[in-house]
Amino acid sequence: MIRLQLTIASVIAVIFAGGLAPTARAAESVTYEVASSDVGTASGIEYFDGARRDLLQNVSLPWRTTVEIANPTSLGTDGAEVRASWSTGRLNKFVMVRIYFGDKVRCENALDLGNAACYGSTPFTTAIK
């Protein structure tokens, strides 16, 4: 009887452990883009590469890179994110930052204030359609 109870307890433990284990997800292809017809160089571009945040300085525009991210829509520090900063000293010098999930635009933001950002957690656009 004790052997049967131990066997049943073991089977139940295995079932629950498998049911509660996190499901592995394949990384998604995420493309970051920073472009402008008004500004030739971004003083800084910061983005999450799937493992850590990278900061590039004095980057010629347009700039684009593709990375693999396990959870690009995360609200945490492991989600897709791109920021660009620039300084022209004048208004109406727009820079556009974009995040693509595959070939679909997830976020795009155009600003002339010297700093623009996009986050994979938030579908967003400033484009006029």
Predicted segments, located by residue:
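Secretory targeting and sorting signals
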Residues: 1-26
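A generic structural signal for short, solvent-exposed coil/turn residues
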Residues: 18, 24-26, 36-39, 89-91
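Noncatalytic modules at the cell exterior or secretory-pathway interfaces
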Residues: 26-37, 75-84, 129
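Extracellular, modular beta-sheet/disulfide-rich ectodomains of secreted and cell-surface proteins
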Residues: 27, 33-59
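Mature extracytoplasmic domains of secretory-pathway proteins
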Residues: 48-95, 101
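Proteolytic-maturation and junctional protease-sensitive modules
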Residues: 99-107
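C-terminal partner/receptor-binding element of secreted or periplasmic proteins
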Residues: 106-129
